Amino acid sequence: VTIASSLAGRVLDTIRRHGMLRDGERVLAAVSGGADSVALLDVLGALRASLGLAVSVVHVHHGLRPESDADAEFVLALSARLGLPAHVERVAVKRAPPWDGLEAESRRARHAALQRAARAVGATRIATGHTADDQAETVLFRIVRGTGLAGLAGIPYRRDRFI
């Protein structure tokens, strides 16, 4: 048993337990080029045959860092190696009042781009990669902000078409 197959098996169990995907579904993988989303893409690639998934890839290019172009090229090359269709969605992040801050405005632009991309490829689900560290960070951030019990749940397995 390899680490990759063990991870794919655990992910498959989670997908089934939480009803995240149905067999034959069309999925858009949101891939930034970071470790979380690359792992997501690798696992979706490993599971697509057994679940009959049609997987497409999108990279949202915020243009905020000098490495943004290299990240996009990396995601396109990785997708090509895996035999998956991919494209880049360039977004303009709002930087004028009323303004909620760079992180919030980037998230808003990214989510809108992901919804557009999903419609364009006919995806019923948008997969994003999150780790246990992301979960812990989300819960801690919400505690600091004075969350109620619902905020202690962290990142949900499913929210609308996002998984």
Give names to the regions the model predicted.
Residues 1-163:
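Core alpha/beta nucleotide-donor-binding catalytic domains of modification enzymes
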